[in-house]
Amino acid sequence: MSLNFDFYTLFMEGLQSIEVFVALLGIIAAGLISVSLVSKIGAKVLPQPSESRVADFLPFDRLLSDGTTLRCSNGSYVRVFKIDGVDLTAAREEVIMSMFEARKSWIDNISSTQVNCRIYTIRERAELAENKSNFGNPWLEKVDGKWKESLTRVYKNDHYIILSVPDRKDAIKDLNTASQSTIANLNDYGIRVMYEDENSPAEQSPIYPFVRVLNPISKPKPKARKAVGFQLKELMTSEGIHFTGEEGIIKFFSGTKTKYVLTIGIRSSGDYMDEAMVSSLMSIDCEMTMLHSLVPLYTPKARAILMQQQKMATATSFSSGVVSQYSEALSAIEDSDADHQSLVQYSMNFLVKGDSLEEIEFAESEIQRICRLFSVTPVRENWIAQATFFNQFPGYDTCGRTYFYLSRIVALAVSFEQISTGLPRSDWGEGAITVFRTMTGSPYRFQFHITAGEAAVAHCCIVGPTGQGKTTLLTFLAGQAMRHEDLKVYFFDRHRGAEIFTRTVRGAYVGFSGERKNVSLNPFDTRDTRSNRDFLRNWLRSITMATDALSEREASRAVTTAFEYLRPEERKLKNLYKSCFSPTGSMRRELYRWINPEQYGNIFNADHDSLDLSGNRFVAFDFTEIFDDDVLAAASISYIMHRIQSESTETGSPALIMIDETAPMLKHEMFRDNFIKGLQEGRKKRQAYLCAFQQPNIVDTLGVGDAVRGQCKTMIFFRNTQATPESYEKWNLTASEYDFIEGRTYRDCPYAILLKRPDADDGRGESVILDVNLGGLGPYLKLYNSSIKNVLLVESLIREYGEEAFVTKYLEGFGG
């Protein structure tokens, strides 16, 4: 037993200044009582390196009749718990502290039961569920396939707690007490005891986590059933294992496949440890098991250890401060109030896994890099790799690098972090819109909807400065959403940003004026319904701004005349102009410009309205020039929004209404009124409005801040290095969320976004950082390019090769 008497980090800081964001862990070498037993572990308790029948050395004997308790060969008892975990990535400080105190209380409470505890965090590749898709477009199918290929290396972290108690009087009673404390203290983490009966799935069996670490290749899922002794051990091991002795490498083999495992321990650390270190380690691009071994010591035993060490320090130390620090530690374990802490015997190890030596060496280098950022020194375990491997199982309780810590310190190391996973379905149908990676490498199933329930709110607001990729993300999400075959997408565009993608999916890119005009409009060329009649009356009043009683009667007479006295081909505004409006009335005077060819007469007087919303699944409207004319903008917006609402009402099909660069459009009263109405009523029509802004406070300047924040239950924030706290003040961000926006965190992921849903998860909220780097699309990323240079290139390719062939030529670089 070796000693280091610089106790300030371990005890004094642990008692006085627990910070959860940048937390004092005080682990390993910088001020601790260490019990380093590396030199004391021999082959007498472990199989020889050449052995491959690991079943011979497993401790398990049987699963008891309660379906939850394992009995070991040495008479000890084991109980296993699954922890769902919580996402505290952007939680508020009071929530983080509350969850931290729950973990600390759990450790303190089980100290009186004198049980051994192991915590597994098993990080394995996640297989993405087959995502329903019926795009109806070959290019969308190819994009989706390419995106799936880029997500082959995504991971899931699973947490397990394993309690074990040696064969002694009241062993089961102590195990039950510890189990009750574990469930009570960690209830908010989503904890459940693992249980097996005839009908339960194998993943719920108490043997399942042990099977996972024993079989990293084949990943079988056996059940214990009534297997006893060696039969149970054989059942749990389907793979061979070889402790090579070659620089600590362990080999698993199953058939022709081999998996390499490397064990890494913690040799020393600096004074401070951020919880972010553990989070970063469990985000590395590799499979691994993080093993925490802890034995919370019963107070009399802890007291005896500390008093003995204090006496030794008195005799050997030249510093009176060292002795007083022991007194502080003794005070902590004796305290009966909130300052009480238990003394814990603790170790942390990593077992990294890979299909090649290169993979595990990469993982080792990443662990080294991350740990050293936090002044921690990891070490590859060589000849004690075998011991570290067997430390995963009850009965093998002699750890290679074991240290004493106070419970607050250990509680910081075992955070049970679990990043949000998104939703598998929405009101629009089965499957996610798309899947993104989180910062831990786990898959996140993106939906616009806040829940999977029927008619859930799906409105979304995107905030980010220019040049961050908002248009690219919008068009990508629009295309991915078209996996729902009945979905209609309406994209309000400016400066032709979505034109390339629209033409790729064979959608309609609609221009209303000038050289880009390609549609003929006639609001009266429509079915005779009450809704259409009401709209036309209101539309006539809005484009003339005539509100007097005579104008009201004239508008009603014109609509009645159109549907009851004119043939369909005669229903035009110019045919109603003289017959329905008084020469001396204000409405006739104001309507003149809408029939005069020199003004707006050619806009809404077509023989046939060619704006086809029923035959096109993707329609983009180019509003670049329309907004240069306030009068034309109001008339056009109101008509288009009416057509969209009518289509949704008549078909019942879901609709995605995407408004790129929303702020300039909201300056127009007619658009603003329709936009707010859509946010308020769109949910009932299965509509999702997506709006995008460059500045976070522009919505308040435009007078729609409360409506946007209140109705857009999904918020996406791009980074903004020029951000000020004042500009984001009304978005109710946490400190860590704002740190991300300002660019202080996740700097190694330049294409990350913050997805925030304050009302998700039954009001508990959701906040997750997603990697939206679309580089995995390869050449298909060009389909989302919004630069005018590429738009003009596509225009020329269409003229030369036609609508059918231009995409291939464009992707091949023709004309570039």
Task: Please describe what each predicted stretch is.
Residues 422-449:
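N-terminal pre-Walker A segment at the start of P-loop NTPase domains
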Residues 533, 548, 561-624, 631-650, ...:
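Conserved P-loop NTPase motor module
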Residues 187, 372, 482-483, 503, ...:
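Anion (oxyanion) recognition and catalysis
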Residues 81, 619-621, 657:
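Hydrophobic positions in the central parallel beta-sheet of the AAA+
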Residues 77, 159, 488, 617, ...:
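The start of beta-strands in P-loop NTPase/AAA+ ATPase cores
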Residues 87-89, 118-133, 140, 147-154, ...:
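Switch/coupling segment of Walker-type NTPase motor domains
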Residues 442-443, 448-480, 486-498, 508-516, ...:
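Conserved P-loop NTPase motor cores
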Residues 2-421:
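Extended, folded cores of ATP/NTP-driven motor/assembly subunits in large transport
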